[in-house]
């Protein structure tokens, strides 16, 4: 689960570079939306990873 959190963080950083520096041109708004969605998914995945690490449950 923590690997997904890092993946979402990388996606968020890439979206931020493309969206906030105006490199993407017309895709700025889409990049900003992807950035915020990826940040939310990163936070959820990080919290779930830490919670699952604390429990001894495995799937």
Swiss-Prot record:
Keyword line: Cell membrane, Membrane, Transmembrane, Transmembrane helix
Family per similarity comment: Belongs to the UPF0391 family.
Spans traversing the lipid bilayer: 4-24, 30-50
Location(s), subcellular: Cell membrane
GO cellular component entries: plasma membrane
Protein name: UPF0391 membrane protein AZC_4184
UniProt superkingdom: Bacteria
Organism: Azorhizobium caulinodans (strain ATCC 43989 / DSM 5975 / JCM 20966 / LMG 6465 / NBRC 14845 / NCIMB 13405 / ORS 571)
Annotated InterPro entries: DUF1328
């Amino acid at each position: 689960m923590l690997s997904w959190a890092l993946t979402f963080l990388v996606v968020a950083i890439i979206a931020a570079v493309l969206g906030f520096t105006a490199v993407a041109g017309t895709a700025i708004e889409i990049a900003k939306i992807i950035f915020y969605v990826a940040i939310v998914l990163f936070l959820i995945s990080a919290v779930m990873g830490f919670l699952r690490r604390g429990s001894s449950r495995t799937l």
